[in-house]
Amino acid sequence: MNDTLALLQKFNAHPDSRCWYVAWNPKGTLLASCGGDRTIRIWGREGDSWECKTVLQDGHQRTVRKVAWSPCGNYLASASFDATTCIWKKKNDDFECLTVLEGHENEVKCVAWAPSGNLLATCSRDKSVWIWEVDEENEYECVSVVNSHTQDVKHVVWHPTQELLASCSYDNNVCVYKEEDDDWECRATLEGHTSTVWGLTFDPSGQRLASCSDDCTVKIWKECQPEGGQEGTDAAWKCVCTLSGFHGRTVYDIAWCPLTGALATACGDDGVRVFKEDETADPDQPAFSLSAHVPKAHTQDVNCIAWHPKEAGLLVSCSDNGEIAVWNYQSGV
């Protein structure tokens, strides 16, 4: 390992609470965090450090599990254990709650915007994935409810350029969805993990998907076009690589750097790891090596990892101990 992962700053973001998730706005000027204290905190850079700019605390009655910025950066969505999703509008340095999306029967575990900004996906412990459409008046309408998982759905993520959605679940599977005749349906089920799948990330091209699991592995799935290339036939997703033996406990989150292609993981063994792809390997049989590892990045489980969208190598992680850590990853090659 010639590469380094250096700590730039660590701060107590959600005191006496878990910090569940962190998300950069599209420009990378703001970082949103959420936690068990029912708050969302917005962080901005002041010189070399990150300072809390505002606290959103009136939206939810229970833990806020995930936050997601709209592609334009003017809206923030928050998913909560109170079974609702709040949509916040940025107004100068402040945020106001525009609307509350209701319908899930249990905790909402994740929320994600499509690259167009016109669609939003939510998922829940009620085993369902909901697709919401956003109109010009900022009205949100549920256009599809998909029940393709048999257990709690942990995470949803959109393809970087297409209206293609993936979800993962306590049922050990990953589902890939597309719209068909005005309805969304599961077009592929990716089976291979032997325990809960916690997180998903597309590579910058959208041709590959990485999943992380309670089985302590990371799997890389590649989109394979059907033979003969018939029109209307769905692409299949094939597992082309499994990273095993690197993580000591559950891998809770995974992030593919949009700038460098490095893959970072957040783990229940308190560690943060970065993997690098062997560029000489066959694309159909990719190989990844562990390039940097901080064994005790936090004193408790690491819940989330997020690459900065504009600065290569800048990475944040957050933990059950309420902390956020800011890292600089440098490749030795």
Curated annotation (Swiss-Prot):
WD repeat residue intervals: 14-53, 59-98, 103-142, 148-187, 192-231, 246-285, 297-333
InterPro entries, alphabetized: CIAO1/Cia1, WD40/YVTN_repeat-like_dom_sf, WD40_repeat_CS, WD40_repeat_dom_sf, WD40_rpt
GO BP term, example: iron-sulfur cluster assembly
GO cellular component: cytosolic [4Fe-4S] assembly targeting complex
Keywords recorded for this protein, A-Z: Repeat, WD repeat
Domain of life: Eukaryota
Pfam families: Beta-prop_WDR19_1st, WD40
Family: Belongs to the WD repeat CIA1 family.
Binding partners and assembly: Component of the CIA complex.
Matches recorded under HAMAP family: ciao1
Task of the protein: Key component of the cytosolic iron-sulfur protein assembly (CIA) complex, a multiprotein complex that mediates the incorporation of iron-sulfur cluster into extramitochondrial Fe/S proteins.
Name of protein: Probable cytosolic iron-sulfur protein assembly protein ciao1-B
Organism: Salmo salar
Lineage, broadest ranks: Eukaryota, Metazoa, Chordata, Craniata, Vertebrata
UniProt gene name: ciao1b
